[in-house]
């Protein structure tokens, strides 16, 4: 059966993974090459960039390493440091911070001695839960941006998203019997998504869900927010040149100190091209320093029902996967904002989506339309290779 998307005007889908498409990642480290099966993402670090003056390359060497066990994705760090020992020290710190933040923001698993987002969900309607300040800050951040952007991305939509998660898991494990969630179940769950019932007591560091049937799902923001925390801490610790790639999020620290490039090149993956991420199958390249890029797309987590691809980005207005675009990419300073906005813009019709992006200072965006056309804000065009950057 031919696979078609929810939008009748969309092209047929090429075979895709979970938004984390398999490829062989070859990481060059000083004196050795490590080959790993890793996960490709919508954004790809590229070798191409503007050429600058040489000089720093004599002082800095390139190192990289990856994490496979946090935030359900591959996290890769590429950095230029004076020595491998210094890189290893920075990476060890980043690894521990990502693991701690993963445990705090996890909605599926318990950890001994930790009250996390799952703990909050487990106590919905029962009592406030005392949590780490980093959970308080994440939820305040998400509520603030929810209100600033019209309420499309709602961390209180856990009841609805859990239904989709369960049906997607079942559909992926047993494709022949994959089903749509019943709309009556989704509408019943929708009654329990009022973000105002997420009661945050910042002074006492507690969170209480006033509706016993509601739950939090921070998947649209947690990974980017955690990436921003780690990037800022590493810059403060003296890391001058690095890129952190976490799923569909990329955060650059400084510029590449290789004596060749003045900016990092980030490729926007073509959803319908080869699963091997290289410069031959990207839609475009954007160039950044000290900035973040995030993408949300319909080719990430999904399953198929009767030939229809059902991805994981659910429109709160319809309770169904949004079908305005193939992907949306956002560039801004803060990785958490980029992560949040890439989802929000994906959930809005183009004119509203573009108007929102243009109303926010320091935010640029690109939209991959169902027919493959790429539209972009003027500021995004200024840093896109196809536009002469």
What are these regions (language model features)?
Residues 3-9, 15-389:
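Mature catalytic core of soluble alpha/beta enzymes
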């Amino acid at each position: 059966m031919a696979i078609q998307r929810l939008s009748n005007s969309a092209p047929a889908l090429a075979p895709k993974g979970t938004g984390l498409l398999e490829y062989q990642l070859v990481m060059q480290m000083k004196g050795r090459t490590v080959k790993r099966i890793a996960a490709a993402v919508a954004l790809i670090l590229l070798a191409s960039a503007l050429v600058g003056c040489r000089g720093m390359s004599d002082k800095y060497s390139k190192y990289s390493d990856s994490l496979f066990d946090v935030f359900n994705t591959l996290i890769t760090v590429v950095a230029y440091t004076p020595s491998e020992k210094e890189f290893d020290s920075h990476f060890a710190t980043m690894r521990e911070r990502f693991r701690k933040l993963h445990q705090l923001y996890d909605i599926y698993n318990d950890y001994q001695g930790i009250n996390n987002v799952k703990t909050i969900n487990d106590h919905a309607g029962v009592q406030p839960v005392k949590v780490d300040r980093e959970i308080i800050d994440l939820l305040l951040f998400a509520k603030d941006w929810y209100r600033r952007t019209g309420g499309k991305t709602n961390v209180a939509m856990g009841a609805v998203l859990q239904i989709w998660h369960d049906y997607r898991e079942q559909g992926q494990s047993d494709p022949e019997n994959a089903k749509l969630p019943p709309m009556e179940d989704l509408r019943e769950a929708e009654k329990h998504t009022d973000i105002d019932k997420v009661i945050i007591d910042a002074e006492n560091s507690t969170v209480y869900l006033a509706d016993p049937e509601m739950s939090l799902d921070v998947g649209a923001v947690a990974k980017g927010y955690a990436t921003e925390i780690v990037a800022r801490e590493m810059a403060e610790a003296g890391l001058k040149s690095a890129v952190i790639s976490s799923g569909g999020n990329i955060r650059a620290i400084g510029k590449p100190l290789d004596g060749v490039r003045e900016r990092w090149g980030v490729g926007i993956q073509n959803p319908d091209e080869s699963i091997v991420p290289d410069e031959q199958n990207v839609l475009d390249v954007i160039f950044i320093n000290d900035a973040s890029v995030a993408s949300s797309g319909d080719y990430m987590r999904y399953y198929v029902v009767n030939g229809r691809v059902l991805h994981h980005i659910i429109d709160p207005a319809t309770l169904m996967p949004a079908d305005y675009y193939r992907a949306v990419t956002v560039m801004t300073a803060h990785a958490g904002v980029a992560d949040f906005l890439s989802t929000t813009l994906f959930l809005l019709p183009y004119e509203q989506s573009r108007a929102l992006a243009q109303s926010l200072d320091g935010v640029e965006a690109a939209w991959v339309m169902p027919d493959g056309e790429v539209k972009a804000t003027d500021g995004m065009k200024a840093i896109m290779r196809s536009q002469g950057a």
